[in-house]
Amino acid sequence: MGVQVETISPGDGRTFPKRGQTCVVHYTGMLEDGKKFDSSRDRNKPFKFTLGKQEVIRGWEEGVAQMSVGQRAKLIISSDYAYGATGHPGIIPPHATLVFDVELLKLE
């Protein structure tokens, strides 16, 4: 499957991230059953990553690249675009499909 992007609320429709830019996002990560495992919103601190530097899972690289600034979307990411057969011990089980609620706040 890879990554599926479902818009929750639209962005500006013009400003999309490019490789090398820093994406500033708020997110909540959940397992398919809705169990939350991480959230920048709970910490009240946006998360930053550089697109194209493999600092995040492949599903984020490809999913966030399709979002415009201000957009909030649900990213449904298959395990091969996330943590695969290994998972993340104690947090994400092996072969888990992940669901992220991501808002692209700005680009730097």
Curated annotation (Swiss-Prot):
Signal sequence bounds: none
Molecular function terms, GO-annotated: FK506 binding; identical protein binding; peptidyl-prolyl cis-trans isomerase activity; transmembrane transporter binding
GO cellular component: cytoplasmic side of membrane; cytosol; membrane; ryanodine receptor complex; sarcoplasmic reticulum; sarcoplasmic reticulum membrane; synapse
Pfam families registered for this protein in UniProt: FKBP_C
The reaction(s) this protein catalyses: [protein]-peptidylproline (omega=180) = [protein]-peptidylproline (omega=0)
UniProt keyword list: Acetylation, Cytoplasm, Isomerase, Membrane, Rotamase, Sarcoplasmic reticulum
GO biological process, one term: heart morphogenesis
The keyword Chaperone is assigned to this record: no
Domain (PPIase FKBP-type): residue spans on this chain: 20-108
Keyword check for Cell cycle: no
EC number: 5.2.1.8
InterPro entries: FKBP-type_PPIase (IPR050689), PPIase_dom_sf (IPR046357), PPIase_FKBP_dom (IPR001179)
Major enzyme class: isomerase
Reported regulation of activity: Inhibited by both FK506 and rapamycin.
Residues carrying N6-acetyllysine: K53
Positions of post-translational N6-succinyllysine modification: K53
Subcellular locations according to the entry: Cytoplasm, Cytosol; Sarcoplasmic reticulum membrane
Its membrane topology: Peripheral membrane protein
The organism's place on the tree of life at top rank: Eukaryota
Protein family according to the UniProt entry: Belongs to the FKBP-type PPIase family. FKBP1 subfamily.
PANTHER family, per the entry: PEPTIDYL-PROLYL CIS-TRANS ISOMERASE, PEPTIDYL-PROLYL CIS-TRANS ISOMERASE FKBP1A-RELATED
Function in brief: Keeps in an inactive conformation TGFBR1, the TGF-beta type I serine/threonine kinase receptor, preventing TGF-beta receptor activation in absence of ligand. Recruits SMAD7 to ACVR1B which prevents the association of SMAD2 and SMAD3 with the activin receptor complex, thereby blocking the activin signal. May modulate the RYR1 calcium channel activity. PPIases accelerate the folding of proteins. It catalyzes the cis-trans isomerization of proline imidic peptide bonds in oligopeptides.
Self-association and partners: Interacts with TGFBR1; prevents TGFBR1 phosphorylation by TGFBR2 and stabilizes it in the inactive conformation. Interacts with ACVR1B and SMAD7. Identified in a complex composed of RYR1, PDE4D, PKA, FKBP1A and protein phosphatase 1 (PP1). Interacts directly with RYR2 and RYR3. Interacts directly with RYR1. Interacts with GLMN; rapamycin and FK506 abolish the interaction with GLMN in a dose dependent manner.
Protein name: Peptidyl-prolyl cis-trans isomerase FKBP1A
Gene source species: Mus musculus
Gene name of the encoded protein: Fkbp1a
